[in-house]
């Protein structure tokens, strides 16, 4: 199954975001763009960071 993320739906909601120029909170260091192995597991740090960012925004929407 493929999941498509609508960046217009999410990215524009973040105050710091300037339209996916990677200068917002979601910006990562070059070494974080690659998958890494930690404790025998493959980790995508960029995906973790953006997922947490979206989760925070969803919680804010629930509170409204």
Swiss-Prot record:
GO terms for biological process: symbiont-mediated evasion of host restriction-modification system; symbiont-mediated suppression of host innate immune response. The keyword Kinase does not apply. Keywords: Host-virus interaction, Inhibition of host innate immune response by virus, Restriction-modification system evasion by virus, Viral immunoevasion. Pfam families: Ral. Ral interferes with the cleavage of DNA by E.coli EcoK restriction-modification system, by modifying the activity of the host methylase. This modulation allows incoming, unmodified phages to escape the host's restriction system. Belongs to the lambda phage ral family. This is Restriction inhibitor protein ral. It comes from Salmonella phage P22 (Bacteriophage P22). The lineage of its organism: Viruses, Duplodnaviria, Heunggongvirae, Uroviricota, Caudoviricetes.
